[in-house]
Swiss-Prot record:
Post-translational modification: Contains one covalently linked phytochromobilin chromophore.
Protein name as annotated: Phytochrome B-2
GO biological process: detection of visible light; protein-phycocyanobilin linkage; red, far-red light phototransduction; regulation of DNA-templated transcription
Function: Regulatory photoreceptor which exists in two forms that are reversibly interconvertible by light: the Pr form that absorbs maximally in the red region of the spectrum and the Pfr form that absorbs maximally in the far-red region. Photoconversion of Pr to Pfr induces an array of morphogenic responses, whereas reconversion of Pfr to Pr cancels the induction of those responses. Pfr controls the expression of a number of nuclear genes including those encoding the small subunit of ribulose-bisphosphate carboxylase, chlorophyll A/B binding protein, protochlorophyllide reductase, rRNA, etc.
Assembly description: Heterodimer between subunit A and subunit B.
Xref: InterPro entries: GAF (IPR003018), GAF-like_dom_sf (IPR029016), HATPase_C_sf (IPR036890), His_kinase_dom (IPR005467), HisK_dim/P_dom (IPR003661), PAS (IPR000014), PAS-like_dom_sf (IPR035965), PAS_2 (IPR013654)
Binding site for phytochromobilin: C353
Domain Histidine kinase, chain residue ranges per copy: 923-1143
Basic residues biased stretches: 28-38
Region (Disordered): 1-48
GO molecular function: phosphorelay sensor kinase activity; photoreceptor activity; protein homodimerization activity
Taxonomic lineage of the native organism: Eukaryota, Viridiplantae, Streptophyta, Embryophyta, Tracheophyta
Amino acid sequence: MASASGAENSSVPPSPLPPPPPPQIHTSRTKLSHHHHNNNNNNNNNIDSTSKAIAQYTEDARLHAVFEQSGESGRSFDYSQSIRVTSESVPEQQITAYLLKIQRGGFIQPFGSMIAVDEPSFRILAYSDNARDMLGITPQSVPSLDDKNDAAFALGTDIRTLFTHSSAVLLEKAFSAREISLMNPIWIHSRTSGKPFYGILHRIDVGIVIDLEPARTEDPALSIAGAVQSQKLAVRAISQLQSLPGGDVKLLCDTVVESVRELTGYDRVMVYRFHEDEHGEVVAETKRPDLEPYIGLHYPATDIPQASRFLFKQNRVRMIVDCHASAVRVVQDEALVQPLCLVGSTLRAPHGCHAQYMANMGSTASLVMAVIINGNDEEGVGGRTSMRLWGLVVCHHTSARCIPFPLRYACEFLMQAFGLQLNMELQLAAQSLEKRVLRTQTLLCDMLLRDSPTGIVTQSPSIMDLVKCDGAALYYQGNYYPLGVTPTEAQIRDIIEWLLAFHRDSTGLSTDSLADAGYPGAASLGDAVCGMAVAYITEKDFLFWFRSHTAKEIKWGGAKHHPEDKDDGQRMHPRSSFKAFLEVVKSRSLPWENAEMDAIHSLQLILRDSFKDAEHSNSKAVLDPRMSELELQGVDELSSVAREMVRLIETATAPIFAVDVDGRINGWNAKVSELTGLPVEEAMGKSLVRDLVFKESEETVDKLLSRALKGEEDKNVEIKMRTFGPEHQNKAVFVVVNACSSKDYTNNVVGVCFVGQDVTGQKIVMDKFINIQGDYKAIVHNPNPLIPPIFASDDNTCCLEWNTAMEKLTGWSRADVIGKMLVGEVFGSCCQLKGSDSITKFMIVLHNALGGHDTDRFPFSFLDRYGKHVQAFLTANKRVNMDGQIIGAFCFLQIVSPELQQALKAQRQQEKNSFARMKELAYICQGVKNPLSGIRFTNSLLEATCLSNEQKQFLETSAACEKQMLKIIHDVDIESIEDGSLELEKGEFLLGNVINAVVSQVMLLLRERNLQLIRDIPEEIKTLAVYGDQLRIQQVLSDFLLNIVRYAPSPDGWVEIHVHPRIKQISDGLTLLHAEFRMVCPGEGLPPELIQNMFNNSGWGTQEGLGLSMSRKILKLMNGEVQYIREAQRCYFYVLLELPVTRRSSKKC
């Protein structure tokens, strides 16, 4: 409502918001969980956020009415009492009146004047009472020969007659602009007095509002220089923000308050953050030493009205010059249906309660700036990323203070950069939190595998480490396992009874107030347990997390009561806000954040499976075949994306080439072949460093390769490449490249890919410019297509060069842009940029060049004169005179080809899919361990029972299969298989056990496909003991046999496994088994593409192909070999393997 932040600023948009329905005000946050929790999580969050906003609109309106009534009756307004939560409904008319009062109050601040104008006719529709005096126009002016005194000022007057001719031209030009705000400020002079003003324009529903702020100089050139100087200061502050170490939001906020105070000179500057429950907190502060600190102060949500927050996303800067000054009335045409909308005006007067609040805290002036970050993608409209008001940067001064518009504009740029930097930090923090939660979940899963479910509360880490809480508990099989601050066992049983009685159909519940959630025993728990999150594991087993009341977490350096503040709790003041906040959160905990609930829900799903396994430990676990289908689908998707990316790279108009780990070319597209004159077949295998680049680039390329092979990727590096063939005559080609580490799907670096941009033409221009300054104009304006688009600025960022290529690219002629400000006028009004963030980034690049810091290949996009989207890379270099002084900036554009954009997009998509599949693979490997543990446990139980020989054989076969699966899961190391460095674990084993395990793995598929299995296996081989890696042999043979079964004709077909052993005696006494395995089926057998995948070393196309390829390589490591043979009526795998026979078997032989 009234806030120390001065954020009374905003209100509703020009077309009033529909009055929200008057719901019951209920600020506790209680949510039920269901099985579809994750699917609708973001939608639920949005609905919850909207309902909270509607509730706050209603409460804002109620408080506004109480304040107004207290003024009329002469009673004091007791803020801390009025803000207490109430279920009182608010009439719709009262809400409408509140919104109208804030939006169309009819008064402005007296430090400037306001005129509203009908857009087509320039006719005055409304004006502030002080406009005449400020412009120097008096009603008593006596007509004279000097027409300067003939200006008439009244409703219906053409506003152009009030200003000089040049000012009228500027107004006409601004009125015709598509985005009028980008023209601000307009430098205009009163026709009568000659006084200069900043004209700040914005459109409303009935016309254009012009805020007139007196300027401090009469020379517009000095004004431009002052604006540029303000921008330079802002850019310096932005550079400081960008140079900060990552991962520290507090440091970022501390730095921005220092920068803003240095820029503006206010006595106090704060960063005010909005929490998820809409209340606010001062998280950073810099101030005059004698002022009371506000760091750590929390405000109730109603301190910043919802209407104000909404408009802060459109109107990002709000200044109050003097809260004690009398507001100036706005006079308007009677034909207007409703009072003039002032929400976008820089002059709008503060509301009475806000002025009173500022006066009570000893603040006279304020400047408030919005901090905007990206919201949830789901909230965006029309494909655009939504924006969220994260908080405010608030400036206070103990005396009247007015900041000129150029400096406010520079501060707004600083806020945009702060928002971008903050957004990155928050994303990194969220990712870090997610990793920590995943790590904790993994450790908890390992505990469940090694121990009973109670391990998650008896060992470290425990469930308390999963989310921030004061206590946690597990209720399992009627036993209570508490940790930290928790209810007693009797109380927890009572809570469970309440949950089952009122929330049985849900899978969980979270609340910040058990009392408001309806639990009747909440009072007996006291402040120690206010908030609770519970996850139902089974009908009788539960997980709990508990939080104490919020006030326990709140610390404020200024909260100490001063004896002289006798009315501290009643008057509107930061102390009463803090008291009101503590009243609001009484018996409440901090709310449970969405990320925390996601972590709880994930653990809930894991525990359900674990508890089921514990309950059914004697049953055999079966792996869900859908996992295999999911992997296959993912592989197919990746394969499709990979093929499309290869096609795009081959046909791209940008040079793209790749090398292996030895730096030799293994990829060379058509464009780089065209530039260098070197055909792809000749380029393959050449050394990039020794054969393809000039000597002066060898060291650069060598470093690029070395870093990229370590996973450290560099961007925008220029290399000088050789050319070949008689047409090129050993000329140089200059390419700016990005080095990308090429990784296989196990995330190991296997080479480097270079995506480049040919800058030979630009290099020629730059060299000629440096060496032959006299040829400057001839070079820049040469229509030769090799000359890139070029524009330049003076040291005030005004455009002074715009070459032929820029005219052709943008559709704007040189005459249209010369002399205009590059930021705002040229790029902004003429060539529209996408959003204020793009303008901020362009301004930073331009000012960096003016400061001597060049920028290479900055992504830059805009709309040309005809609305066509242009994407380019911007290179900005300083311009210097003969004495070496910087006098402006040179800018070059490199146009991005659609093919390259598409190729890069496909590459990013492939990397995204690869990462997703890697996560799925890691999840599957982790998930499979649990049922395998069950199988192992079942086998151990069966071993202790009386079994027949046949049953023992079945058990041995099951154990062999289980060990094979564990081996594959633990040793997912494809790189070592590829390069032949896989370590084999050899030992003695019976060959018959291996054959039994191999056959068992295809029996289900044989039955499903109605196939007959023919075994031609000599009896003596089953008892033969040999030496080797049993599990790898088992893996290889089962993979070959399984593929034969898959492609055998069905139904009523057959599959044969034939083993032919031969014993060979070696001279030194060693006995070798020479075993031939044939896996046979009739018909056409495996598809040729699959066999090609199996024997192809360069890659794989399908899941089966990868498996066969890996099996062939593992077999080769064991000195074996495999062939696939097609005969007239049948096909088969022919596997040869030699294994040493152990002494035990040698004696039998």
